[in-house]
Amino acid sequence: MDNKDEYLLNFKGYNFQKTLVKMEVVENIENYEIRDDDIFIVTYPKSGTIWTQQILSLIYFEGHRNRTENIETIDRAPFFEYNIHKLDYAKMPSPRIFSSHIPYYLVPKGLKDKKAKILYMYRNPKDVLISYFHFSNLMLIFQNPDTVESFMQTFLDGDVVGSLWFDHIRGWYEHRHDFNIMFMSFEDMKKDFRSSVLKICSFLEKELSEEDVDAVVRQATFQKMKADPRANYEHIIKDELGTRNEMGSFLRKGVVGAWKHYLTVDQSERFDKIFHRNMKNIPLKFIWDINEE
């Protein structure tokens, strides 16, 4: 793909979205002052970030659970490197929740004190690939891919926002002992959502009543989120970032195994070979179909 410099800003080997980030912010990320009770949602793009923002917003904010406060999830758990709404992060009340796509080596040094918590959400990369393909076709701030085949090559070359998927997840996993981090699988959460919410609450040391857990589970389903203007990003993508067509949405399907409808057998097998070569020493569990055990 041509003109990638129009969309990507590369800093220390990592691709940021060029129009949403300022170089002075990027250069000072590692020196940003972290609070002991900060929480970071870390993901590779298209891996369940918005879902996790909604889950943590529901866990932490009673006004979000009982719908008495009309605050968007992007303002409750803003993107650390992409301050789209120009919030003053230093004045945010504790505990602060941040979302981020950055790799382990660019995060604030204070996260290595192991007091602030990191929730790393990961998703099977074939579904990430297909979700990213559709998202790039929708959003004006991303290069518009021609075909799944051409985008698959771009994705596997790491010439996308977020850089190479393998480097991102492997880097975080191999350096997990440097941080207070928990890895969560998008697919596991889909299979047993309530248990996953309880696991997240335990990691965050956040006690909720059974009734509150029920409220989190009920409101963080994909269908409920899609209908919730606080969480569906519709206003943000259409009015603030811009789309190529009116039909698309930020929250598209959120299903497991959608890749089967888009990748040919040959593409899938080529992807598998690259996956196994890169991930053979990473014991994280991956689910490629929702019917898998």
Curated annotation (Swiss-Prot):
Annotated binding of 3'-phosphoadenylyl sulfate, by residue: 46-51, 123, 131, 220-225, 252-254
Question: Which Cys residues form disulphide pairs?
Answer: none
Q: Which GO terms describe its biological process?
A: sulfation
| Any coiled-coil regions, as ranges | none
User: Where is the protein situated, by its record's location annotation?
Assistant: Cytoplasm
Q: Name one GO cellular component term.
A: cytoplasm
Active-site residues, as the UniProt record annotates them: H101 (proton acceptor)
Domain of life where this protein originates: Eukaryota
Name the SUPFAM superfamilies for this protein. P-loop containing nucleoside triphosphate hydrolases
Any one Gene Ontology MF annotation carried by this entry is: sulfotransferase activity
> What are the protein's UniProt keywords?
Cytoplasm, Transferase
The EC code for this enzyme is 2.8.2.3
Pfam families from the UniProt entry: Sulfotransfer_1 (PF00685)
Recorded catalytic reaction(s): these are:
a primary amine + 3'-phosphoadenylyl sulfate = a sulfamate + adenosine 3',5'-bisphosphate + 2 H(+)
Family recorded in the similarity comment: Belongs to the sulfotransferase 1 family.
Q: PANTHER family, per this entry?
A: SULFOTRANSFERASE SULT
Stated role: Sulfotransferase that utilizes 3'-phospho-5'-adenylyl sulfate (PAPS) as sulfonate donor to catalyze the N-sulfonation of amines.
From the Swiss-Prot or TrEMBL record, give the protein name: Amine sulfotransferase
The organism encoding this protein is Mus musculus (Mouse)
